[in-house]
From Swiss-Prot:
Major subcellular site: cytoplasm
InterPro entries: PRC_barrel-like_sf, PRC_RimM, RimM, RimM_N, RimM_N_sf, Transl_B-barrel_sf
Assembly with partners or alone: Binds ribosomal protein uS19.
Domain PRC barrel: 93-167
Keyword Transferase recorded: no
Name of protein: Ribosome maturation factor RimM
Keyword match Membrane: no
Localization: Cytoplasm
GO MF assignments: ribosome binding
Length: 172
C-alpha cells in the first residue's frame, strides 16, 4: 500500500488530548476534518487514528483523536508522522498539483539544474512558496506564480523557472 505523508504531531495542546499538527499536506482543512482517518507511524507500523475535532491555530492544526481524550494518552506520540492512503487523494484541475508531486522535482533555470524543490509553504491567502535546495548555496525561495514557474512536468520530476532579477542570489 502506498502512503502519503500529511504532517507530524509537533506537540500537545492543553490537557484534553489535543495535538498540534505541523501540516505537510495540501488542503489541511479538508484533510484534518472531523471523522477523517489518519495513520500514525509507530515504529514502522501504521496505527489508525480517527479525528474527533479540528481547528486551525496559528501555523498549526489542532486535532483530537478518538480514544485519546487526555494528554497522558497522546503525549507519547509527539514527533511521530501522520499518513493517509495514497488513493484517498482527489483529482485536481489542470495546472493544479499536490505538494508530493512537486517536492523532489529538479528546478531548472536557463537549461541548468539549480537544485531540487525541497519544501513548499503556504502564505496567508497569497501564492505558495517553493523552497529550492541548492548544493553549496543557500536555499532559494520561489513564489508559485505564472510569471516565475514556467513549466511543471511531474512525470519527469522537473520544473522550469524564470526567476525575477535578484530572486536567486548566487553570491553565497
Amino acid at each position: 500500500m502506498d502512503w502519503l505523508y500529511v504532517g507530524k504531531i509537533a506537540n500537545t495542546h492543553g490537557l484534553k488530548g489535543e495535538v498540534k499538527i505541523l501540516a505537510a499536506t495540501d488542503f489541511p482543512e479538508e484533510r484534518f476534518k472531523k471523522g477523517n482517518t489518519l495513520f500514525l507511524d509507530v515504529d514502522g507500523t501504521k496505527q489508525e487514528m480517527t479525528i474527533t475535532t479540528y481547528r486551525p491555530h496559528k501555523q498549526f492544526h489542532l486535532v483530537t483523536f478518538k480514544g485519546f481524550d487526555n494528554i497522558n494518552l497522546i503525549e507519547k506520540y509527539k514527533g511521530l508522522k501522520l499518513y493517509v492512503h495514497a488513493e484517498h487523494v482527489h483529482d485536481l484541475d489542470e495546472h493544479e498539483f499536490y505538494y508530493h508531486e512537486i517536492i523532489g522535482c529538479e528546478a531548472v533555470v536557463d537549461g541548468e539544474v539549480i537544485g531540487v524543490v525541497d519544501d513548499i509553504f503556504e502564505t496567508n491567502g497569497a501564492n505558495d512558496v517553493w523552497v529550492i535546495k541548492r548544493p553549496g548555496k543557500s536555499d532559494a525561495l520561489i513564489p508559485y506564480i505564472e510569471s516565475v514557474v514556467q513549466e511543471i512536468d511531474v512525470d519527469a520530476k522537473r520544473v522550469v523557472i524564470t526567476p525575477i532579477p535578484g530572486m536567486i542570489d548566487d553570491e553565497d
